[in-house]
Amino acid sequence: MLDKIPNMDDITALVGQSLYDVWQKLCSAIDEQYDMDCIWNSGGRAWTYEYKYRRGGKTLCALYARENCVGFMVILGKDERAKFESGRSEYSESVQKVYDDSKTYHDGKWLMFEPVDTSLLGDFMRLLAIKRRPNRK
């Protein structure tokens, strides 16, 4: 948990206006579909901030921010990987490449994206739907 939660100006100053817009659109899309607890943390060694979407002790996804960069991470477990692989042709080539290049750990395949625009937003939301059905009507 962070001592001071970053505000809009803090994130904008860190990532820049265009990436802040990507961050905002991604958060809005997730918030529209999912009722989740949102938790701010430090981003560890590689990132300045982590903004995690969780519910019932399970993480849906996390957004990361560092200087001039935004990250979006989703971890797919064994069953979720099977669902992705059965429908992989529905995803863009760049999402398939990140999937193929991502390391598989004991708890799943960690997919880290560094979006520069909103072109992959639909793919990101499909990945989240594999993990959890949207719970907002």
Model-inferred region functions:
Residues M1-K137:
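Charge-dense, helix-prone N-terminal extensions
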